[in-house]
């Protein structure tokens, strides 16, 4: 229900940014034909939930989020989706929603596991903690290294699927 509610919020936002009378004075900066969505945790599930109901979102990424709202059994109309997660989200891992929804994704898809990460590493918190002098002593990766990995894969995914720029990383 939470991811579905966030999907409705995103659809409202897209309506307000791309409609005939945009609510933001810089809405002309939004490329209305190349919209992608990425999210962490429930936001990653919201990316898939939004794609299930809104064809304007052409590509999506779930960064370490449980699929509380399942991907529809008939998929996402062939649109690309990237799963980027910690080792607990490996195939056959502790979150079986990834295994279930992987089978439902019907377009280009990748499932990437980032070794040495925890759920929180897919957000800004590990970078901010490092900058504050409070790094996680149990994490083998620095916040900056984790951020570099996330930036590289997220950028490559959207460049490939929204800009049609080949990406050897993927």
Residue spans for each PLM region:
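Alpha/beta-hydrolase active-site loop
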Residues: 1-29
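The feature captures the conserved acid-bearing segment of alpha/beta-hydrolase catalytic domains
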Residues: 58-121
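Conserved hydrolase catalytic core segment
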Residues: 49-58
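Alpha/beta-hydrolase-fold serine-hydrolase catalytic core, especially in secreted/extracellular enzymes
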Residues: 116-119, 125-170
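Divalent metal-coordination and catalytic microenvironments
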Residues: 10, 35, 111, 158
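Extracytoplasmic/secreted proteins, especially bacterial periplasmic and envelope-associated proteins
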Residues: 5, 9-12, 46, 149, ...
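Core-facing hydrophobic residues within beta-strands of well-ordered domains
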Residues: 30-32, 57-58
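Gly/Ala-rich beta-loop-alpha elbow adjacent to hydrolase catalytic centers
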Residues: 38-43, 47
């Amino acid at each position: 229900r939470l991811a579905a509610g966030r999907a409705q919020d995103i659809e409202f936002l897209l309506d307000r940014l791309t409609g005939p009378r945009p609510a933001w004075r810089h809405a002309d900066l939004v490329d209305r034909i190349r919209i992608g969505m990425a999210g962490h945790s429930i936001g990653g599930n919201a990316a898939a939930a939004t794609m299930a109901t809104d064809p304007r979102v052409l590509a999506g990424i779930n960064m370490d989020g449980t699929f509380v709202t399942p991907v529809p059994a008939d998929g996402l109309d062939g649109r690309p989706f990237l799963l980027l997660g910690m080792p607990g989200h490996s195939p056959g891992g502790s979150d079986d929603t990834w295994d279930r929804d992987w089978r439902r994704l019907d377009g280009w898809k990748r499932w990437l596991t980032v070794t040495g990460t925890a759920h929180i590493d897919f957000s800004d918190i590990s970078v901010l903690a490092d900058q504050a002098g409070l790094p996680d002593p149990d994490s083998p990766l620095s916040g900056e290294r984790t951020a570099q990995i996330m930036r590289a894969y997220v950028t490559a995914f959207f460049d490939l699927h929204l800009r049609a720029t080949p990406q050897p990383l993927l």
